[in-house]
Amino acid sequence: MISSRFTNVVRSGLRFQSKGASFKIGASLHGSRMTARWNSNASGNEKVKGPVIGIDLGTTTSCLAIMEGQTPKVIANAEGTRTTPSVVAFTKDGERLVGVSAKRQAVINPENTFFATKRLIGRRFKEPEVQRDIKEVPYKIVEHSNGDAWLEARGKTYSPSQIGGFILSKMRETASTYLGKDVKNAVVTVPAYFNDSQRQATKAAGAIAGLNVLRVVNEPTAAALAYGLDKKNDAIVAVFDLGGGTFDISILELNNGVFEVRSTNGDTHLGGEDFDVALVRHIVETFKKNEGLDLSKDRLAVQRIREAAEKAKCELSSLSKTDISLPFITADATGPKHINMEISRAQFEKLVDPLVRRTIDPCKRALKDANLQTSEINEVILVGGMTRMPRVVETVKSIFKREPAKSVNPDEAVAIGAAIQGGVLSGHVKDLVLLDVTPLSLGIETLGGVFTRLINRNTTIPTRKSQVFSTAADGQTAVEIRVFQGERELVRDNKLIGNFQLTGIAPAPKGQPQIEVSFDVDADGIINVSARDKATNKDSSITVAGSSGLTDSEIEAMVADAEKYRASDMARKEAIENGNRAESVCTDIESNLDIHKDKLDQQAVEDLRSKITDLRETVAKVNAGDEGITSEDMKKKIDEIQQLSLKVFESVYKNQNQGNESSGDNSAPEGDKK
């Protein structure tokens, strides 16, 4: 019989170090069957060769930075902005858009434009948070075969990790363009309160983008690095991070280059997106009350309202009121309908007051876990776009009894901190040590569905702990070890992050076999678990079944897909550049034709104009996404028209040269004139 329960026999006080095989409970990487792998925590003494970029993969926007010597620098994208919208879209022509271009077309393509997908990463489809999101977004969230929440656009499904991978690919391309060479190594940030599945899924996104993710750093910790890089004084700092989709509060102690996290807390489903949704609901309900029309099922209308709500939210951080004007939002038998309403800051603050209040308890818990009073906090750092909202700032002041610091950019601090950690790993930044913590308690299920903790939350990582358990039934030869993360006393209320079977236990009365379970948490916060039957002290047959995520083959397919897109993106870029060159050539030729039309053979002119028309039609096809026309085809057509134009204008050039020579022969130097 296989029991899903253990009896906890740690009463004896025994503590052992596991010598059995270590198995990564990496649900998000290994899907329905996870493979065994040895794991060791790197000491960090070996330095990485080549540049290491820091990426803040945000819910609404992402940011990229790198160390230039001892100074972190934010790298602007191709559009010239220092942050990139975390938006991915698929057009009817099969083109994939990322960033600014994807966000611009969202209002006309809402069903196939993905935003805020970070809120879904590493989550199960049936989780309450996912079910709430399904009602609020215009795109389809579907259940994958492994139970995860995936996305669907134009008949194809994508994992949230894959969408994150597309965004990371964009960031990698930006960095490679800036540095003039391919970039492989990166430090990527995650919300401090992300669980193991979400961290694994983020690393998978990096793999899909072709990146070697050297370290996963908690966002508040990264912001503290950005704040404290040049600070010499010891300090205890609170980082209040309210971004687009998540909220974190971390308390750190800065001491002579050592950044030690004392505690962390938060809410992985609280951020600017929720503030937008609150305002969208208000606008839709007000319109329904005034006009008798329900817009909630009209995806196009809701997307327009969402964009207007986001804009109004930002404006109300600096204005006391703003107008929302959306003409022709819908129509009925009486004609077109429009939205015209004024929103005041006070009105908006009342709408989102419950959301702002949700940040208070995590802050109190973080202070309690750190064993600190508010008076002992030396500085409060604000991170994330929502911390620009006056009501949020006032709430922070009321919690910590002090004015927040203004020295860091809320949108860029996390990426800068990631770049600093990259500098540490590459050896460019010295005398800096980062000690982070695990955000949630870790343990296993024991008899009666009890959650038995092995590692408590806010334990400094990397860490390792072992504990001895036994069987719950006589003659039991196998046990199922179920690993959970959370703070509740029963496993049913916590997050299952993995499970595996230990077989080959020698039959014995219940309570006699000694089964040692060891937990390892590495510097990324990734969890490894091993189990060993101490009585037999031999290799056991262990099958590990993951709770969710991507299989190795799925990741490999997505990496190949990303590479394919990367190649097509480069081909597309080259085609556009050749199209621009072709248009420039055509314009120059037409200009010369107009200037010299009286001196040219008319048949030759007609042939040349025909070639110009043909070339422009080809350019139009390329711009419309015709992949049948290669870059070489374009170059050949440009060369042909240039050669033809040279022949057409040859007589003009000859006449000009002859005229110049004759005028030169007829003119003598001033001194030679008689």
Swiss-Prot record:
Pfam family for this entry, one: HSP70
Catalysed conversion reaction: ATP + H2O = ADP + phosphate + H(+)
Region described as Disordered: spans on this chain: 655-674
Biased composition (Polar residues): 655-666
Recorded family membership: Belongs to the heat shock protein 70 family.
Quaternary data: Interacts with the Fe/S cluster transfer protein GRX5. Interacts with the Fe/S cluster assembly proteins ISU1 and JAC1. Component of the PAM complex.
Gene Ontology BP term (one): [2Fe-2S] cluster assembly
Coiled-coil positions: none
Superkingdom of the organism of origin: Eukaryota
Location relative to the cell: Mitochondrion matrix
Listed CDD domains: ASKHA_NBD_HSP70_Ssc1_3 (cd11734)
Gene: ssc1
GO molecular function, one term: unfolded protein binding
InterPro entries reported in the protein's UniProt record: ATPase_NBD, Chaperone_DnaK, Heat_shock_70_CS, HSP70_C_sf, HSP70_peptide-bd_sf, Hsp_70_fam
NCBIfam families: PRK00290.1, prok_dnaK
Protein name per the record: Iron-sulfur cluster biogenesis chaperone, mitochondrial
Cystine bridges: none
Transit peptide: 1-43
EC identifiers of the protein: 3.6.4.10
